[in-house]
Curated annotation (Swiss-Prot):
The chain crosses the membrane at residues 82-102, 117-137. Belongs to the ATPase C chain family. The keyword Transferase does not apply. Mitochondrial membrane ATP synthase (F(1)F(0) ATP synthase or Complex V) produces ATP from ADP in the presence of a proton gradient across the membrane which is generated by electron transport complexes of the respiratory chain. F-type ATPases consist of two structural domains, F(1) - containing the extramembraneous catalytic core and F(0) - containing the membrane proton channel, linked together by a central stalk and a peripheral stalk. During catalysis, ATP synthesis in the catalytic domain of F(1) is coupled via a rotary mechanism of the central stalk subunits to proton translocation. It is linked to This protein is the major protein stored in the storage bodies of animals or humans affected with ceroid lipofuscinosis (Batten disease). PROSITE patterns: ATPASE_C (PS00605). There are three genes which encode the mitochondrial ATP synthase proteolipid and they specify precursors with different import sequences but identical mature proteins. The modification N6,N6,N6-trimethyllysine is found at residue 109. The gene is ATP5MC2. One of its GO terms (cellular component) is proton-transporting ATP synthase complex. This is ATP synthase F(0) complex subunit C2, mitochondrial. It comes from Pongo abelii (Sumatran orangutan). Pfam families: ATP-synt_C. The keyword Transmembrane applies.
């Protein structure tokens, strides 16, 4: 079968078919390939480099898709900002527990205070991390 194909196909058909197969499927469907002769192929090879033969594909975004992207950014940033409110609630819980613990056993004042500072630091770090993620979503994406 391969020997029959060698006799049927011409060099220009093989070259135009190979160019057709190297293009993306969307470009093949949307645009029909040009029939190239040996003279036009040789003039293309001499006059322009191979990189200029590749068609540039520009992505176009509509106003609706840009609005959807913007809305998704705001929703994601709002969800990340909820963590900052959780951090505030955590800090309140830590110091509320410090007051209750000190009222129950005043002799553990130093140990309770060190645990409260540790809880405050961890809660504040999580709040700052959530705020950083919210800003990254808004301004870096």
């Amino acid at each position: 079968m391969f020997s029959c194909f060698k006799f049927i196909s011409t060099p220009s058909l093989v070259k135009s078919t190979s160019q057709l197969l190297s293009r993306p499927l969307s470009a093949v469907v949307l645009k029909r390939p040009e029939i190239l002769t040996d003279e036009s192929l040789s003039s293309l090879a001499v006059s322009r480099p191979l990189t200029s033969l590749v068609s540039s594909r520009n992505f176009q975004t509509s106003a609706i898709s840009r609005d959807i992207d913007t809305a998704a950014k705001f929703i994601g940033a709002g969800a990340a900002t909820v963590g900052v409110a959780g951090s505030g609630a955590g800090i309140g819980t830590v110091f509320g527990s410090l007051i209750i613990g000190y009222a129950r056993n005043p002799s553990l004042k130093q140990q309770l205070f060190s645990y409260a500072i540790l809880g405050f630091a961890l809660s504040e770090a999580m709040g700052l991390f959530c705020l950083m993620v919210a800003f990254l979503i808004l301004f870096a994406m």
